[in-house]
């Protein structure tokens, strides 16, 4: 069935009930083909805001002329009458906040190590090579800077003007036999005085040689990959991670449209259940020229099994873990490290004595669902908030200990031994995002949803007094980049119906913004975009559920409604700023113009509402999250909507929920549209799925009750499925397998629309329009 006809049928069913379908006229001034062009219709907004080294310019990526891609623009806030202009790539020197305490800044530019003197504004090229230079690290000695070439560390000393190689990590096992260890060589030495005399003279000469420089001893890493190579600020230690990655079976994505006229395959991610990698944390003592590996077998409950296994006996071996990069103490031979278990149940923060390798466990976070939350991260390999205050005695990190993600402080050397070492720095039923320290170390700068769970305030927090100063806390999202002197804010701001624009403000409490960019097009500005109301309704378990509500004027209301389901699961969309689902936002305005009510729900598993909200789908996706949509349907009925005229649609996780609504609760919705949907979680990726459903071989029931394909026989309402054929995330195989089930079950009230050139995130406006 053609898609436009199917859409017309769905609209007609919602408007007039299940009689013969007919074309539904569009009563809106919005044209679907135009709004599906996305930012070409809206206007391309500024992004990637950053400052120049000298703090005089704000750089940002922008495309005001609707070119094929973004270009770098600059704006000088101190220059009266200044307007954004296109930057000369040769003159761009970006500020690096990690080097803010130094009088100079080093960068890798075009394969060269460069230095910028902040006092004289002089720019110098230090070292050029065809080798790959990367990963600049600063030393306690301001004249020394470390950088990597390949897998090894080098040091540049500005005072001496030299570059020294500090490490020599090599693949393989090294030479297994010494050059003098063969039988024949031993025999020669044993039989002939001439050979013995030669060896003696050679040894004597070597003993008299004066070595001006220490040789760099090779360290062989075997078949492992070496990662996260770091130098301690005092230069005494180098840390690194050796990783053994299993050869997991990759999936294939077939491409049917190509320039040569032939199909071809590309590799894609493995499926859930793959073998976990093995990691080791190594420490190289530069003075002793020795390497040891930190023994993590003493981590609390390292062999404990999760509760879902119903087995109280510990594992016979340690659980596999992944360690993040070290955060070195600048005044001692200590470092803190964030370690995660690969089964997603535990997080340990340890304080390591770099001399001995002994460690103290300063924080252990355990969650029988999975570790996650803002500043913590539910992805094992993604780093969370962790660092040292300027006193070099206090570690800061984030934890969901109270049910919401907040900042905590740990005293490594408390003045009073009986004092509680770990204390909460912030608290409340709201969450912290994007933590950074001020240059003087006296303040935290953070984003938070303190004023409203749908806002992102920009707050300044005094560490000594724990006072909170709202810098930007009005409705919307304040994405702030601080100038090098921290006196000026470059702000990327949006609200519910106003896309992102660049503003500036003075760094004071409740500052006033000055707008710099005007990005939206005449076509976008010609329409009066609604500000959807952010509301709450009660879930059937008594909990508040947040949602965006779009309502037509009473005279236009047709008592039919559409429920939109956002993707990702852990994502917030019922907020007070510009949505990542901007096409859907515009589509919802079009629907409201046509008399529909639209409800966009932040169902259980969504971001911004704390730990219990985040983990409510553990071991059952399509359970509590789907129930929130059924409760949302009841809420719509309370507004006068006909319960038989409510449709549901969404993409990715939203498509999955749509399928579960149509298949596991048949009869609840007369029609649904499922876009790029997961149909069987055993076929999705490992990192995301294992957090929530564990592993298919250890928790098969969680996978069965969470996968729409097992409920295919229940289909009653009208269903359309839409999927990109080169989707390397939720792969095309998902919708093909469910289609085969429908065919075998003799289901007829479904349609499949495929998009041959589209991946998970559609790129072409004609595909969006057709979808």
Predicted feature descriptions by range:
Residues 1-10:
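Bacterial N-terminal signal peptides that target proteins for export
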Residues 2, 87-88, 93, 165-168, ...:
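Poly-acidic low-complexity segments
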Residues 2-3, 74, 567-569:
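Disordered, low-complexity tails and leader-like regions
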Residues 4, 31, 623-624:
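A diffuse structural propensity rather than consistent per-protein peaks
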Residues 8, 281-282, 458, 587, ...:
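Generic structural signal for hydrophobic residues
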Residues 12, 22-469, 475-476, 487-488, ...:
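Beta-propeller folds
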Residues 16-18:
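N-terminal signal peptide c-region/cleavage motif recognized by signal peptidases
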Residues 470, 477-771:
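Serine-hydrolase catalytic core recognition
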């Amino acid at each position: 069935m053609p898609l436009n006809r199917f859409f017309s049928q769905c609209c007609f069913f919602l408007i007039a009930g299940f009689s013969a379908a007919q074309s539904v006229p569009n009563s809106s001034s919005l044209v679907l083909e135009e709004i599906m062009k996305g930012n070409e219709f809206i206007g391309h907004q500024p992004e990637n805001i950053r400052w120049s080294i000298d703090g005089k310019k704000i750089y940002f990526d922008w495309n005001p002329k609707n070119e094929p891609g973004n270009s770098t623009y600059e704006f000088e806030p101190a220059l009266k009458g200044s307007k954004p202009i296109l930057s000369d790539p040769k003159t761009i020197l970006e500020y690096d906040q990690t080097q803010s305490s130094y009088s100079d800044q080093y960068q890798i530019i075009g394969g060269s190590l460069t230095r910028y003197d902040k006092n004289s504004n002089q720019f110098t090229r230090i070292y050029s090579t065809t080798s790959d230079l990367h990963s600049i690290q600063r030393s306690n000695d301001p004249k020394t800077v470390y950088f990597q070439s390949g897998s090894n560390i080098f040091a540049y000393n500005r005072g001496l003007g030299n570059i020294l190689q500090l490490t020599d990590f090599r693949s393989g096992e090294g030479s297994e036999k010494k050059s003098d260890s063969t039988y024949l060589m031993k025999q020669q030495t044993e039989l002939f005085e001439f050979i013995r005399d030669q060896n003696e003279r050679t040894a004597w000469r070597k003993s008299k040689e004066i070595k001006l420089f220490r040789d760099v001893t090779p360290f062989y890493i075997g078949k492992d990959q070496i990662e996260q190579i770091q130098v301690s600020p005092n230069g005494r230690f180098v840390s690194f991670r050796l990783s053994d990655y299993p050869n997991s079976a990759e999936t294939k994505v077939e491409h049917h449209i190509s320039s040569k006229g032939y199909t071809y395959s590309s590799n894609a991610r493995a499926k859930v259940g793959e073998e976990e990698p093995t990691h080791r944390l190594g420490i190289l003592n530069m003075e002793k020229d020795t390497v040891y590996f930190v023994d993590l077998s003493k981590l609390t409950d390292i062999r404990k099994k999760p509760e879902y296994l119903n087995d109280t006996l510990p594992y016979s071996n340690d659980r596999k873990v992944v360690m993040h990069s070290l955060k070195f103490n600048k005044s001692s031979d200590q470092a803190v490290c964030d370690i995660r278990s690969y089964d997603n149940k535990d997080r340990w923060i340890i304080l390591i004595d770099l001399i001995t390798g002994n460690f103290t466990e300063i924080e252990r976070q355990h969650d029988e669902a999975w570790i996650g939350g803002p500043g913590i991260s539910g992805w094992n390999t993604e780093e969370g908030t962790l660092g040292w205050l300027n006193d070099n005695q206090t570690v800061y990190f984030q934890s969901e200990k109270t049910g919401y993600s907040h900042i905590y402080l740990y005293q490594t050397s408390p003045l009073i031994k009986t004092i509680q070492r770990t204390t909460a720095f912030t608290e409340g039923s709201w969450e912290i995002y994007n933590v950074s320290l001020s240059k003087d170390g006296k303040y935290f700068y953070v984003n938070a949803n303190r004023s409203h769970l749908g806002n992102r305030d920009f707050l300044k927090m005094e560490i000594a007094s724990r006072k909170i100063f709202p810098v930007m806390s009005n409705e919307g999202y304040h994405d702030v980049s601080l100038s090098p002197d921290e006196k000026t804010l470059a702000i990327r701001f949006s609200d519910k119906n106003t896309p992102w624009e660049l503003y500036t403000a003075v760094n004071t409490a409740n500052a006033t913004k000055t707008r710099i960019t005007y990005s939206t097009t005449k076509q976008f500005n010609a329409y009066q975009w609604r500000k959807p109301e952010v509301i709450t309704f009660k879930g059937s378990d008594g909990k508040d559920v947040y949602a965006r509500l779009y309502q037509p004027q009473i005279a236009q209301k047709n008592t039919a409604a559409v429920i939109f389901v956002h993707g990702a699961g852990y994502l917030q969309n019922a907020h007070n700023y510009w949505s990542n689902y901007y096409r859907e936002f515009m589509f919802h305005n079009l629907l409201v113009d046509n008399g529909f009510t639209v409800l966009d729900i932040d169902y259980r598993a969504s971001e911004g509402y704390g730990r219990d909200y985040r983990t409510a789908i553990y071991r059952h996706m399509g359970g509590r999250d789907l129930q929130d949509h059924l409760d949302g349907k009841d809420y719509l009925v309370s507004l006068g909507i006909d319960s038989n005229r409510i449709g549901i649609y969404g993409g990715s996780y939203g498509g999955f929920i749509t399928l579960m609504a149509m298949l596991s609760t048949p009869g609840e919705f007369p029609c649904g549209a499922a876009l790029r949907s997961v149909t069987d979680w055993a076929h999705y990726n490992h990192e995301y799925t294992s957090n929530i459903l564990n592993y298919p071989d250890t928790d098969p029931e969680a996978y069965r009750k969470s996968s729409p394909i097992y409920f295919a026989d229940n289909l009653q309402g009208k269903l359309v499925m839409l999927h990109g054929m080169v989707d390397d995330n939720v792969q095309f195989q998902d919708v093909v397998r469910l289609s085969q089930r429908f065919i075998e079950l003799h289901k007829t009230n479904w349609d499949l629309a495929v998009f041959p050139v589209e991946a998970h995130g559609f790129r072409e406006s004609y595909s969006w329009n057709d979808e």
